[in-house]
């Protein structure tokens, strides 16, 4: 039972780290990255659809993306979705493809992006600590119900703390890498 709690907690912490990593990928760094469009939705036959599912996105140059819609009729809605997103980019429509030039980030904008990255990292660490708290509550309940002794539960709590520290450290590393990437000119 203790092993199940530890395994479940570790799995949920791992998922949280992965979610945080995916969140940080969407932060614009001044380099072209197709993943920056993962959260951009366009109306497609009345259904909000990610533009990554409506088009192919390629990176011909370090600061340019080319978006080629699978259906030319969806070009306008994709263009509007990008323009209305909070990415701060402006697509150019040449009739066949959309070209998106990624502007160089200003020092101030870089610092803002670092703050956003740190905020997302902190959210990830809070989620990990919430998983830890829930695991601790489950362990205490096992002890209270008399299923396991104090020593076994204390050892499990210590193990849960080690697991928590490991995943919090992973989030810190991911955020530090993103910060370095953002501050690189």
Curated annotation (Swiss-Prot):
GO molecular function terms listed in the Swiss-Prot or TrEMBL record: ribosomal large subunit binding
Keyword tRNA processing set for record: no
InterPro entries (UniProt xref): Ribosome_recyc_fac, Ribosome_recyc_fac_dom, RRF_sf
Keyword Protein biosynthesis in annotation: yes
Primary residence: cytoplasm
Pfam families named in the record: RRF
SUPFAM superfamilies listed in its UniProt record: Ribosome recycling factor, RRF
Disulfide bonds: none
GO BP term, pick one: translational termination
Coiled-coil boundaries: none
Compartment(s) of residence: Cytoplasm
Record keywords: Cytoplasm, Protein biosynthesis
GO cellular component: cytoplasm
Superkingdom, taxonomy of origin: Bacteria
Family: Belongs to the RRF family.
Functional note: Responsible for the release of ribosomes from messenger RNA at the termination of protein biosynthesis. May increase the efficiency of translation by recycling ribosomes from one round of translation to another.
Name of this protein: Ribosome-recycling factor
Species of provenance: Corynebacterium efficiens (strain DSM 44549 / YS-314 / AJ 12310 / JCM 11189 / NBRC 100395)
């Amino acid at each position: 039972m203790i092993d199940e709690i530890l395994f479940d907690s570790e799995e949920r912490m791992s998922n949280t780290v992965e979610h945080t990593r995916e969140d940080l990928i969407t932060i614009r760094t001044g380099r072209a990255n197709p993943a920056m469009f993962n959260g951009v939705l366009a109306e497609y036959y009345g259904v909000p659809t990610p533009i990554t599912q409506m088009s192919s996105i390629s990176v011909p140059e370090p600061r340019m993306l080319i978006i080629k819609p699978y259906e030319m009729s969806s070009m306008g809605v994709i263009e509007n979705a990008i323009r209305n997103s909070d990415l701060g980019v402006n697509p150019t429509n040449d009739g066949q493809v959309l070209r998106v030039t990624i502007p160089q980030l200003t020092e101030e904008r870089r610092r803002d992006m670092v703050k956003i990255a740190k905020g997302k990292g902190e959210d990830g660490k809070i989620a990990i600590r919430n998983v830890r708290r829930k695991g601790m509550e489950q362990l205490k309940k096992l002890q209270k119900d008399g299923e396991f002794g104090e020593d076994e539960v204390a050892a499990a709590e210590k193990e849960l703390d080690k697991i928590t520290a490991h995943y919090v450290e992973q989030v810190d590393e991911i955020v530090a890498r993103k910060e370095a990437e953002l501050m690189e000119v």
